[in-house]
Amino acid sequence: DYFGPVTVAAVYVSSEKIQLLKELGIKDSKMLTDEKMLLIADNIKAACPHSILVLRNEKYNAVQQKGWSQGKIKALLHNKALLHVLNKISPTVPEYILIDQFAERDVYYRHIQNEKEIVRDNVLFSTKAEQLHIAVAAASILARVAFLKEMDNISNEMNMEIPKGASKKVDEIAAKILLTNGENVLKTI
């Protein structure tokens, strides 16, 4: 997406909650509409310890100018979200932590090597992890809903519908904002 923040979520699903989440319709977010995700997100939040992090564009652009890649940004956010959830569920220790893989394991850990606390124990990485475990599906739904809500906020602030994704329409809206409001405003959305 050209507009909007980077959102990351982590969810702890105990074995007792798996069936409940299935009954709520939690599954791979690519198989759900935005409307359905908006309806079930609060149920996930009520049922499971979670963390949702939103990195708005202004901050995203600032750290990118420092030379941080999108992979590094996502790794830092994932590590922080996992730490939040582990603190919430302590002293419980999850059997394993599954990360929907966006970078190879060694690259992920290289990105976060300078952090004070790094989640390493029982961490697994897999592509298409949403299809493997309901906790990843739940986290993806929470991250998507946080993104959608932030996009609504941006649209309200700009007094126009800000499109999602990347397309000719997105380019046209970006050009309109640049001409009307300037580069500094464009960088914040």
Language-model features: locations:
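RNase H-like, Mg2+-dependent phosphodiesterase core
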Residues: 1-189
